[in-house]
Amino acid sequence: IESAYFRNKFEPELGRFIGSYLGIGVISDMESQPITVTSHLGRFAVVTVGRIDNLEEISAQLLKEKIHFAEMSGSAINPTEVVSILINKGETFKEGIENVYRMVKGSCSFLILTDSCIYAARDKFGRTPIIIGKNEFGYVVASESSSFTNLGYNIVRDLGPHEAIRVSKDGITPIIAAGCRKQICSFLWVYYGYPSAYYLSLIHI
């Protein structure tokens, strides 16, 4: 979904979800998402939320390495494509996520969808939240909890800064432990957060 807060109908797309129990999405004001990649890691899709302060620096380095960008947003490089390239530089998804943490300055939380699971990674300072929910049918991860009640999910917990998990039909598997450094942006929560959302499992905006 691009430049829209809601879509009230998804009928044309519903047939594409038959037989699948996994999915990701994002509302983006700027770039088109998700980005789909086929590489040595297999076929995967990526969505991101946040701001990459050193996007130009990373992009310039990748161009020196003769890597091209195809998912342009107008004349600008798509930040989500940059994240997908950094992920793809790892030998595993864990290494790829760690590469994003190492290279990106700013705030970038993201989800990776594969054929069998979803990886959820919160930015290294915890500025953009990722919250886990659960019901009798499975799990959900989102940037805020406001939709959980209407969909029948209970809040499990927030991911910590620099934390990454793997979500599959078998449950949740830790991938990267949470870091100790947290620099939350309460203004972001107040400005963008829905009134019924909870943050850190206890702050009600």
Enumerate the language-model features and the residues they cover.
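Conserved short alpha-helical segments that host acidic/polar catalytic motifs at enzyme active sites
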Residues: 1-161, 166-202
